[in-house]
């Protein structure tokens, strides 16, 4: 193991790497004071604010004012915003403005949080960055220019593109595979220019600095003391700061007796690090988790130490200075060195030691992961619905200020949960509950907003009661009493494409009639519910233009009324099969039951109750395919070996089947056929522990996206303790054990199986944020997910998805912070499967992933006996984009800053006696090209659209201004630093040139993301 395993990779990289050089002295150390402030993790946000976070900003500001040479970088915005709005005095606010102006306080990264890179979706990464950047720019007129991504557990290749588009000049990471980092240190390859996307030009690359193995914390061991070094304020105490100001583990104060020893320790560490880099400039991070809550004692000890070293530069061979990232990267950039290039590979998965693979968190707390994505999808729909309500003219009584507040609350919650100890599932239970509460409260507000828009009037108005709103993968439940009663259902399509799909409502009666807004009957199906044996699932076929509505009336059918025969939803037929044992002898493949549509024939084996094969009707190829649930067993005792926990995946052995018997039933109707498989852990069990509900839409339905997908929803749990559950799909595809999985729903990574000498199973697990696939020379099997999972290919033709984990161990760290993941929940994840020729799958894969993430939203209102159905808004002009272009956001952000940077700075200098009202006139539009260059002969072409035509339903477009990713830069003013590389990058297309404001015809190239402010005629 160790660095030798990476020699082939390093050999390839060195071809693009300049010859290593030893740093020319004297060494210049940049001491960067910082505090790593997790937005959650072990303690809630409010607990952290009370115990230490507020004191960080209060004391740092005071100490920076005291000493002109002092510096500090601030990273995540959530704690700072809470301090700014709820703690800071006017004097402190003015001091912050002055320190920012002087460059002694620097905001880096600037997002609401430091987001995880493995399991977060691109849309949500952009959201949380936009939230933080919007606040900083609106409040101070500043725009962060460097990243500080030091704690996410691995690094995604999406990040270089993301941060380049945000305007960053350099990027800093830390957690990459331990043996790769060791090898890169020895080869002086920790700094390079990273090309994030194979399709994009060098304008969307970024200079990247990988921290050495000391990472972002100051070395804690000093040879002359049994206390930690350089942590003079000690360790934060919860729930309250100690009244005497004495904290645990406070470093020995710097005195005349020990200052030389301190200096020797610091100098030795700087020199050790300098050998790992190509220049004499050394970044020396001073800080760690929850530091600088007493900045006075920190600086009062470091000041004399730095002075002591600088007075003896000739003796020590180094100089030291307080620095921000701008100071460090400016010095590095001024060397004009030629840097190596890293292509679009990521740094995933991440292992910190040989037996510590951080791949368990890809699945930990699956329920929270699912809720976070549901909240994101709801916010996405709510943003465009509110924008369509506001333009061209608000027609209802809705208060726009209240509406924007609901959206802002959910923006905050969705941004917060992207933190690297949030959606990852690596937080304590009470912090998980905090994230959940914030998400649910935000979703409730946006639900009220959407019901008000779609069903008319202010929140709660009208004679009928709004029932609820449901996003994708959530089924609304309608109940009735003995009176004739019905429901008005509005279905909103948040995508800028026309869609044909099936929505599901759960009702309490089998006789239902459904009509559209014109009173015409629609295609429906009713069947026994999968959730409640006393209820029924009502399926409705719907076709909806982009950013538009369909309205339906759902009534309890009474048969003949006044001579009119109601059209009742046809009832599906159910066929049940007897229970089958897993090890029961059978003549496999002799009694197959087909389920088919225009695209597929699914064959199920009556003798096993298992999927047998799938025929792709386009290519006429039949692929043998089985699916089953298995479990990995995890060790709980640290004395017995490696353990699994929230972070780590360390199975004892290969996965074993977790069931003894399986039942099956088929429910066939006019719209779909459902196949329901129930897996029992033991033959004597009355309750099943696992299930697969497979749905195939029928051939008469239009729409290739609907026909080409096999929808599956699973039930998993509750698990036995120390079990990690997977769904393994095995096929006869000759995949060569090569898996492809996505980075953040943006780009795919090739994942060949690696034969590690130790820990091979978990080190071959990868994050699947939205999709994964395996293929051979003829066919591709695609899996699409509505929440993150761990995914792996442990055998040829296999792909396994980890669905759930339940763990407890006796590791002292986990027990101290309650991080053992004893998750007793039942989870219901969804996957869509697609199988077909690679060309067909290439075309359908990106659009289908977006369709799963952003399904139609159903809004319901109960009707009284005589009440007329509410048909809600009708938008005559849909918003329609080409199939290779995705409407990533359409919103009214509410920012008050001027689009002119100079004017905005003048406004800030004048000051505002009161906070200005939100700007409801500015519309934010972001478009994303879904395809890689050369991926598809048609869909990989640049997409050209006229925004005046696309947005005509919102009004007359009078100006189009292109902005940076988070909206704070006019792209015509954005000039990022150029870092010289050995080879000119010839790959990628030329980025389309910015057009002057008002130019409405735009071209988006493969994988481009372009952001605009749109101005409509008043």
Curated annotation (Swiss-Prot):
Compartment annotation: Secreted
Pfam families on file: Alpha-mann_mid, Glyco_hydro_38C, Glyco_hydro_38N
This enzyme's EC code(s): 3.2.1.24
Reaction catalysis annotation: Hydrolysis of terminal, non-reducing alpha-D-mannose residues in alpha-D-mannosides
A GO term from the CC aspect: lysosomal lumen
InterPro entries: Gal_mutarotase_sf_dom, Glyco_hydro/deAcase_b/a-brl, Glyco_hydro_38_C, Glyco_hydro_38_cen, Glyco_hydro_38_cen_sf, Glyco_hydro_38_N, Glyco_hydro_38_N_sf, Glyco_hydro_57/38_cen_sf
Family note: Belongs to the glycosyl hydrolase 38 family.
Protein's name in the database: Epididymis-specific alpha-mannosidase
Species this chain originates from: Mus musculus
Native organism taxonomy: Eukaryota, Metazoa, Chordata, Craniata, Vertebrata
Gene: Man2b2
């Amino acid at each position: 193991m160790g660095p030798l395993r990476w020699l082939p990779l390093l050999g390839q990289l060195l071809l693009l790497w300049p010859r290593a050089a030893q740093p020319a002295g004297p060494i210049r150390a940049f001491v960067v004071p910082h505090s790593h402030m997790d937005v959650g993790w072990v303690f809630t946000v409010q607990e952290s604010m009370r115990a230490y976070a507020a004191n960080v900003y209060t004391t740092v500001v005071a100490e920076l004012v005291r000493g002109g040479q002092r510096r500090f970088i601030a990273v995540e915005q959530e704690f700072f915003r809470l301090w700014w709005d709820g703690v800071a005095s006017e004097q402190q606010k003015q001091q912050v403005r002055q320190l920012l102006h002087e460059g002694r306080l620097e905001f880096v990264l600037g997002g609401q949080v430091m987001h995880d890179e493995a399991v977060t979706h691109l849309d949500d990464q952009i959201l949380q960055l936009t939230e933080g950047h919007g606040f900083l720019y609106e409040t101070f007129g500043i725009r962060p220019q460097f990243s500080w991504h030091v704690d996410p557990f691995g690094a995604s290749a999406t990040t270089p593109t993301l941060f380049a588009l945000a305007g960053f000049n350099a990027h800093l990471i830390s957690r990459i595979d331990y043996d790769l980092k060791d090898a890169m240190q020895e080869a002086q390859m920790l700094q390079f220019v990273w090309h994030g996307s194979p399709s994009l030009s060098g304008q969307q690359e970024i200079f990247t600095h990988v921290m050495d193995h000391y990472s972002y914390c100051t070395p804690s061991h000093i040879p002359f003391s049994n206390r930690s070094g350089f942590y003079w304020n000690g360790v934060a105490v919860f729930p309250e700061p100690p009244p005497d100001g004495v904290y645990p583990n406070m470093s020995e104060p710097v005195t005349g007796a020990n200052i030389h020893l301190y200096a020797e320790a610091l100098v030795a560490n700087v020199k050790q690090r300098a050998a790992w880099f190509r220049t004499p400039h050394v970044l020396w991070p001073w800080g760690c988790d929850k530091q600088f809550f007493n900045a006075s004692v920190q600086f009062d000890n470091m000041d004399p130490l730095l002075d002591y070293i600088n007075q003896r530069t000739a003796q020590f061979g180094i100089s030291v200075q307080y620095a921000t990232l701008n100071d460090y990267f400016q010095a590095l950039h001024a060397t004009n060195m030629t840097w190596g290039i890293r292509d679009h590979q990521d740094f995933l998965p991440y292992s910190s030691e040989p037996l510590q693979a951080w791949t368990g968190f890809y699945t930990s707390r699956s329920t929270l992961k699912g809720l976070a994505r549901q909240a994101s999808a709801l916010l996405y729909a709510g943003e465009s619905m509110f924008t369509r309500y506001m333009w061209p003219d608000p027609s209802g009584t809705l208060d726009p200020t209240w509406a924007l507040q609901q959206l802002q609350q959910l923006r905050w919650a969705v941004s917060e949960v992207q933190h690297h100890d949030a959606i990852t599932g690596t937080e304590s239970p009470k912090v998980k509950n905090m994230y959940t509460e914030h998400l649910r409260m935000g979703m409730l507000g946006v639900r009220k907003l959407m019901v008000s828009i779609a069903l008319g009037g202010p929140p709660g108005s009208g004679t009928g009661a709004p029932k609820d709103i449901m996003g994708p993968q959530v089924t609304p439940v309608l109940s009735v009493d003995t009176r004739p009663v019905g429901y008005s259902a509005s279905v909103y399509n948040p995508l800028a494409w026309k869609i044909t799909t099936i929505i599901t409502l759960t009702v309490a009666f089998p006789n239902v009639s459904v009509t559209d807004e014109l009173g015409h009957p629609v295609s429906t199906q009713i069947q026994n519910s999968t959730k409640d044996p006393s209820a029924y699932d009502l399926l409705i076929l719907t076709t909806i233009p982009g950013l538009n509505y369909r309205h339906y009336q759902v009534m309890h059918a009474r048969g003949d009324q006044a001579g009119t025969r109601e059209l009742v939803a046809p009832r599906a037929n159910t066929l049940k099969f007897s229970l089958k044992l897993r090890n029961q002898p059978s003549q496999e493949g002799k009694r197959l039951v087909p389920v088919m549509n225009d695209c597929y024939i699914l064959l199920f084996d009556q003798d096993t109750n298992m999927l047998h094969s799938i025929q792709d009707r386009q290519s006429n190829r039949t692929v043998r395919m089985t699916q089953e649930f298995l479990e990995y067993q995890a060790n709980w005792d640290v004395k017995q070996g490696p353990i699994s926990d929230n972070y780590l995946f360390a199975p004892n052995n290969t996965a074993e089947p977790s069931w003894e018997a399986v039942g099956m039933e088929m429910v066939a109707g006019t719209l779909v056929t459902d196949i329901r498989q129930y897996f029992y852990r033991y033959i004597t069990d009355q309750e099943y522990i696992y299930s697969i509900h497979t749905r195939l839409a029928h051939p008469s339905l239009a729409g290739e996206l609907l026909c080409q997908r096999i929808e599956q929803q699973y039930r998993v749990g509750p698990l036995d303790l120390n079990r990690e559950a997977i769904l393994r799909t095995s096929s006869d595809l000759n995949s060569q054990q090569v898996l492809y999985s996505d980075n953040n729903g943006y780009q795919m990574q090739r994942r060949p199986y690696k034969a590690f000498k130790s820990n091979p199973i978990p080190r071959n697990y990868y994050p699947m944020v939205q999709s994964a696939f395996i293929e051979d020379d003829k066919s591709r099997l695609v899996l699409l997910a509505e929440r993150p999972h761990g995914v792996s290919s442990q055998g040829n033709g296999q792909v396994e998805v980890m669905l759930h984990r339940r763990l407890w161990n006796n590791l002292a760290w986990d027990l101290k912070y309650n991080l053992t993941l004893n998750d007793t929940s039942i989870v219901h994840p969804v996957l869509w499967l697609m199988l077909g020729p690679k060309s067909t799958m290439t075309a359908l894969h990106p659009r289908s992933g977006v369709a799963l993430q952003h399904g139609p939203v159903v809004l319901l209102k109960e009707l009284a006996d005589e009440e007329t159905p509410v048909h809600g808004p009708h938008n005559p002009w849909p918003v329609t984009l080409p199939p290779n272009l995705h409407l990533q956001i359409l919103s009214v952000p509410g920012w008050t800053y001027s689009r002119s940077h100079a004017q905005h700075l003048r406004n800030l200098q004048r000051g505002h006696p009161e906070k200005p009202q939100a700007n409801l006139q500015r519309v934010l539009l972001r478009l994303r090209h879904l395809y890689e260059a050369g991926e598809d002969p048609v869909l990989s072409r640049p997409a050209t659209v006229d925004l005046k035509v696309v947005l005509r339903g919102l009004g007359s477009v009078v100006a189009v201004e292109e902005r940076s990713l988070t909206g704070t830069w006019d792209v015509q003013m954005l000039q990022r630093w150029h870092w010289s590389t050995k080879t000119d990058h010839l790959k990628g297309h030329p980025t389309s040139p910015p057009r002057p404001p008002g130019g409405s015809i735009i071209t988006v190239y493969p994988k481009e993301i372009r952001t605009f402010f749109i101005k409509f005629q008043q």
